[in-house]
């Protein structure tokens, strides 16, 4: 009996029963615990590669939302900004039509139209991009341009943008190659003037140069887990040709560049007529590519962001609407949170007016509305889940009391 045991060995590695943890018996052989684990890992890796090769969700022109439908969807989540919505709706529709062109065998090749949105903080740039990705069910990621640096310097490599997109797409490469990347604060990587720099600018002009290959469409080797590249790391090739890049920035001070350009054009040429139609309270609507160049974006990157649109500054009426009207408005979110605890939350109308007044006073934009509401609601959200109340009404006096005891300086930089 002992002799028969010694003859048992793993059919894969050849080790005997005494040399392994245990043997699993099959119909015509054995496998040890070590080989079983290794076989499982190989199987999982092969299945993962198969999923990647399976490809992305097949686009269908009939199912692709038309520009009017895209705008209607945006209207449900974003208040105002009709011009920006129309630009985005048309550009996104044409971009995904372009992806279908490769199956048609047409001789006319449609070029990619990446987008740049200019507007003050809190006007809805990020929300617009996120909402479009939600409608189209494509991978979407947001990248802060301020953390990007040239390769070899402290900070994140340009390729880390694609690493994030891959992670969102669960490493399905074809799916990621149809995704949307929103690069926020693109204005922060502007060079310090209109002229090329003679010194090294690793987080400004250098990053712009690095972004060129991503924006124009090329195959980029991406580290799967992000971070710096090293020789032993397996790279994933990603083709950026069909990735839609949307860039956004506040471009603080660009109004002066626009005004200078308009004044230059006006002098000596029907000056009185042109000056009369210029809205000095909203200079962004007159923005042109040469203004971006004057601000510090290099001509090459401007050329790869051919769709330029602007977002209007939010007035008091727009902020009031943003607070309560969209499908996922801030107030509706808090009502839902309380509803999950079995509590009916209501507000006095004067509370909404007060919140908007403070957002205007501190120039916080739409993003600041949440900070103000959060400050007002913090104490009640802490206490009321432990109480037996079924209803709670936020009064103007309570809202004022909460904001007065809060650190308003913190809200001002929200």
Swiss-Prot record:
Biological process annotations from GO: cell division; proteolysis involved in protein catabolic process
Residue intervals of the ClpX-type ZB domain: 1-51
Coiled-coil zones: none
Sequence positions that bind Zn(2+): 10, 13, 32, 35
Entry keyword set: ATP-binding, Chaperone, Metal-binding, Nucleotide-binding, Zinc
Gene Ontology CC terms, in alphabetical order: HslUV protease complex
Pfam families documented for this protein: AAA_2, ClpB_D2-small, zf-C4_ClpX
Top-level taxon of origin: Bacteria
Keyword presence, Zinc: yes
Keyword Metal-binding: yes
HAMAP family: ClpX
Purpose of the protein: ATP-dependent specificity component of the Clp protease. It directs the protease to specific substrates. Can perform chaperone functions in the absence of ClpP.
Record-given protein name: ATP-dependent Clp protease ATP-binding subunit ClpX
Record organism: Bacteroides thetaiotaomicron (strain ATCC 29148 / DSM 2079 / JCM 5827 / CCUG 10774 / NCTC 10582 / VPI-5482 / E50)
Gene name of this polypeptide: clpX
């Amino acid at each position: 009996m002992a002799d028969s045991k010694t003859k048992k060995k793993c059919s894969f590695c050849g080790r005997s029963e005494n040399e392994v943890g245990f043997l699993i018996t099959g119909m015509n052989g054995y496998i040890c615990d070590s080989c079983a684990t290794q076989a499982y890992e190989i199987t999982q890796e092969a299945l993962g590669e198969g999923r990647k090769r399976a490809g992305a969700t097949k686009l269908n022109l009939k199912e692709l939302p038309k520009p009017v439908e895209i705008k209607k969807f945006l209207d449900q989540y974003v208040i105002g900004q009709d011009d920006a919505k129309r630009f985005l709706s048309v550009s996104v529709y044409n971009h995904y039509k372009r992806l279908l062109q490769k199956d048609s065998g047409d001789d006319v090749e449609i070029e990619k139209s990446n987008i740049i949105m200019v507007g003050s903080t809190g006007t809805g740039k990020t929300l617009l991009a996120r909402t479009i990705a939600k409608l189209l069910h494509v991978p979407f990621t947001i990248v802060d341009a301020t953390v990007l640096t040239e390769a070899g310097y402290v900070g994140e490599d340009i390729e880390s943008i694609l690493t994030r997109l891959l992670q969102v797409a669960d490493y399905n490469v074809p799916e990621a190659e149809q995704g949307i990347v929103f690069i926020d604060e693109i204005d922060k990587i502007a060079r310090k003037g209109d002229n090329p720099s003679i010194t090294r600018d690793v987080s400004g002009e250098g990053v712009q140069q690095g972004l060129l290959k991503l924006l124009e469409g090329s195959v980029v080797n991406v580290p799967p887990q992000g971070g710096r590249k090293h020789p032993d790391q397996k790279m994933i090739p990603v083709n950026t040709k069909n990735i839609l890049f949307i860039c956004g920035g506040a471009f603080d001070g660009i109004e002066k560049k626009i005004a200078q350009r308009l004044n230059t054009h006006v002098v000596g040429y029907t000056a009185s007529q042109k000056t009369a139609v210029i809205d000095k309270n909203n200079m962004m609507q007159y923005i042109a590519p040469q203004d971006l160049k004057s601000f510090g974006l290099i001509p090459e990157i401007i050329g790869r962001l051919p769709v330029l649109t602007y977002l209007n500054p939010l007035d008091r009426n727009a902020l009031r609407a943003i607070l309560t009207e969209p499908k996922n408005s801030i107030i509706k979110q808090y009502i839902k949170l309380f509803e999950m605890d079995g509590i009916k939350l209501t507000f006095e109308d004067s509370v909404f007016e007060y919140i908007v007044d403070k957002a205007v006073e501190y120039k916080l934009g739409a993003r600041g509305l949440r900070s103000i509401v959060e400050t007002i609601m913090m104490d009640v959200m802490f206490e009321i889940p432990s109480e037996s109340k079924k209803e709670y009404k936020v009064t103007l006096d309570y809202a004022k009391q909460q904001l007065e005891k809060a650190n308003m300086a913190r809200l001002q930089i929200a």
